[in-house]
């Protein structure tokens, strides 16, 4: 059964007024057609029988990609002021880099797409089937990690400035006892090896972030108070901004519903949507954050609270309005709210204290503490530079096949 990925209808949201540009409906249809062309270009690459290098994908796609982005630019510019036009241009420049890079990255997973090599490890199977792998870590080893992290916990407690409203401390690990223990704990349950199998390349530790979540935080609350809209029950459900690099969430304390548990929508990594549109919209969001500065709020998407920005957003073609962090914009009591609530899975510490997942595709949230403080570790992985590929590939020429299918 094909499940469509959630789409927020901003036309019915009380915080957003309809587009002021009369050409918006017509441009929306034309923009959807451009996205269809991008999908025709990149989907065969993503599902290639052989891995393709980023350089090769760029050569294969450059001419058509340039035409598509030029068409998108015309449709996105219409009805906009100078600030939004500048943001759109920056986003399209980034998209010209990210779209081929993402397609090349996914081409390394071709056997997963074709079902030629079933996964062996429980980690890879779970990520393939639901988007996440849940487990319990060794209790003694985790306690040693908690003890090692105590000085850093005190440091997070001492940081109260608005610049650290997540109450988090990110560490890019060099070799050291904390990083080594994190990797040992994850190796014990097969997570790095499972990542290597699923993504068809070795993954290395990239960063880890120590996060304290408590009920006093406001960064996720009441974004649309000015419009009389309360915090959405689905707030902070999102996909991550990147396209590569899986994550692991480790609870460092007991977690119940009151602590802001990790939640996800099982299978959402397979729900039907345009990956090309998702990659493009992530670049638009990133450009919006830089262009539309709002220092008068603690909300983590400050630009969404600017009336001028909301007007600019509504003048964009409808598909380009969609946000990676869509959960904040779902109206309570709506069909979309019911859909998310009926599909979500909540991971309490009695179920699992560790979750490995592909947050760039699988929809998830966490850290929304309602009544008690939660301590957790978020661990990021990235492809190991120059790592040998880990799966046997079919020996067919991917380039010839792709050129034939591109038509």
Task: Pin down the residues of each PLM region.
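Extracellular structured ligand-interaction cores
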Residues: 130-132, 234, 243-249, 259, ...
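A short secondary-structure junction signal
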Residues: 218-222, 230, 247, 258-267, ...
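Short, conserved beta-strand element in jelly-roll/cupin
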Residues: 238-257, 349-350, 380-383
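A short hydrophobic beta-strand segment most commonly corresponding to one strand
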Residues: 247-250, 266, 372-387
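Double-stranded beta-helix
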Residues: 258-362
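Short beta-strand His + acidic residue motifs that chelate non-heme Fe in jelly-roll/DSBH
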Residues: 362-370
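Extended hydrophobic/aromatic segments used for targeting, binding, or gating
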Residues: 379, 384-404
């Amino acid at each position: 059964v094909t499940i469509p990925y959630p789409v927020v209808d901003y036309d019915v949201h009380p915080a957003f007024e309809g587009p002021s540009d009369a050409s918006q409906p017509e441009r929306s249809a034309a923009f959807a057609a451009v996205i269809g062309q991008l999908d025709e270009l990149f989907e065969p690459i993503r599902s290639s029988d052989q891995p393709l290098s980023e350089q090769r994908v760029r050569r294969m796609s450059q001419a058509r990609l340039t035409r598509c982005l030029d068409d998108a630019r015309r449709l996105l510019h219409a009805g906009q002021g100078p600030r939004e036009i500048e943001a759109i241009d920056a986003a399209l420049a980034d998209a010209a880099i990210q779209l081929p890079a993402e397609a090349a990255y996914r081409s390394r997973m071709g056997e997963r797409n074709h079902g030629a090599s079933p996964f062996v490890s429980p980690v890879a199977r779970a990520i393939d089937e639901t988007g996440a792998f849940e487990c319990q870590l060794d209790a003694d080893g985790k306690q040693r990690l908690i003890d090692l992290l105590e000085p850093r916990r005190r440091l997070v407690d001492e940081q109260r400035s608005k610049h650290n409203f997540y109450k988090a401390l990110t560490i890019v690990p060099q070799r050291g006892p904390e990083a080594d223990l994190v990797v040992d704990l994850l190796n014990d349950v097969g997570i790095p090896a499972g990542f290597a199998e699923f993504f068809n390349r070795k993954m290395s530790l990239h960063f880890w972030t120590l996060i304290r979540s408590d009920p006093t935080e406001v960064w996720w609350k009441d974004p649309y108070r000015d419009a009389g809209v309360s915090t959405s029950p689905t707030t902070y459900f999102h996909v991550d901004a990147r396209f590569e690099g899986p994550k692991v969430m480790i609870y460092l304390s007991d977690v119940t519903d009151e602590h802001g548990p990790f939640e996800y929508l099982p299978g959402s990594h397979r729900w039907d949507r345009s990956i090309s549109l998702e990659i493009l919209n992530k670049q638009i969001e990133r450009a919006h954050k830089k262009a539309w500065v709002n220092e008068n709020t603690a909300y983590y998407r400050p630009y969404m609270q600017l009336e001028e920005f909301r007007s600019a957003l509504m003048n964009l073609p409808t598909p380009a309005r969609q946000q990676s962090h869509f959960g904040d914009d779902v109206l309570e009591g709506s069909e979309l709210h019911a859909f998310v609530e009926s599909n979500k899975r909540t991971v309490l510490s009695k179920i699992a204290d560790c979750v490995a997942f592909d947050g760039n595709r699988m929809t998830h949230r966490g850290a929304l503490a309602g009544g008690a403080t939660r301590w957790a570790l978020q661990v990021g992985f990235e492809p190991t530079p120059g790592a040998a590929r880990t799966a046997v590939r079919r020996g067919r020429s991917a380039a010839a096949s792709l050129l034939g299918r591109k038509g």
